[in-house]
Amino acid sequence: MSDKSFDVVIYGATGFTGKLVVEYMQEKYGNDEGVSWAIAGRSKEKLIAVSEDLKVGSNVPHLLVDSNDTDSIASMVQQTKCVLTTVGPYQLYGANILQQCVIHGVDYVDLCGEPGWMHEMINEHAEQAKETGARIVFSCGFDSIPFDLGVYFLQKEVIARHGQPASNVRGRVRAMNGEFSGGTAASLGATMASLKEKPELFEILVNPFALSNGFTGPEQAQDSKPIYDEKLETWVAPFFMAPINTKNVHRSNALMDHLYGEDFCYNEMWIQGPGEEGKAAAEFVGSMNPLADAPAPGEGPSKESRDNGNYDVLFCADLADGSTLHAAVSGDMDPGYCSTSKMIAESAICLVKE
């Protein structure tokens, strides 16, 4: 792909999260002659405004692209090594872009947390993607990079120390400070709407191995109601991102020829503390809708709020001798916005540069 005009094209650059990706790219790679990138969207005026607001140089072109116009999508795709798209819900706006990337052998990264659509796209395009060399990477934000890579890092360490992987890993969110993404709420709404038309989608949503290329592993520990974690001596509550994160962790295991083993179990919950207070907190979290107050798509928290956010996730490998090995993944800034924009940008750079 050496004849491509760009390393990365950011599609959705005028949306709230898209602007944060552009801001990060400008700060990190704006003066890097080794990285060529462009921004894309439907409105020329909005693209110009984003460039002016974020002081993006004239060396970053603007591409006019509409997700419903296959010709404009194909033109964008053929100019770049990787398409980074923040335009969701992906089940409504993502299929054409992904398909064109597959056809033309171009890498693709997104922020998708919609397992039904991901399952559909994998079934439809995986074989052709292998033929053309397109690398399609879903969920390159807070869902699911810290969780997927946290499990990977921990299992590699377990294997290095003990010669075999842990058959059970527990993901435990210790802290998460930040507002939920409006895009996440919109994606959930679109998925619920799809359930009315496709009742069979429910089986995909509840199957932890739905993205594992047909593999079906052992029964997984329940994570849908509060429980007491005996080893950590704390109450834990359901974590609303677990349904997509667990599927992506199991998919990675399958894609790596079951590096973690075919008997691998993984669940993910939110630490609430010990005692009666911890139990009450876990029950409260388990009964609430965490996305009820999420901003509308295209909106988001203030810069001060984003900068003051953070997250901290603990991963616990339960070993055959009864001991445990822990690893942690933490990050500064709001996980759903600033950290996510950094993750997806670096995912794209990783694909084209490493």
Regions flagged by a language model, labelled:
Residues 30-46:
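Conserved glycine-rich Rossmann-like NAD(P)H-binding loop of the short-chain dehydrogenase/reductase
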Residues 64-82, 86-92:
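Conserved Rossmann-fold cofactor-binding substructure of NAD(P)-dependent oxidoreductases
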Residues 131, 156-354:
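C-terminal catalytic/substrate-binding lobe primarily of soluble NAD(P)-dependent oxidoreductases
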Residues 89, 100-118:
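ADP-ribose/adenylate-binding Rossmann-like module
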Residues 24-34, 256-258:
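A short, Lys/Arg-enriched amphipathic alpha-helix followed by its capping loop at the start of a domain
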Residues 50-58:
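Short, conserved SAM-binding/catalytic segment
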Residues 6-28:
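N-terminal Rossmann NAD(P)H-binding glycine-rich loop of SDR-like oxidoreductase domains
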Residues 112-134:
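Rossmann-fold NAD(P)-binding glycine/threonine-rich loop
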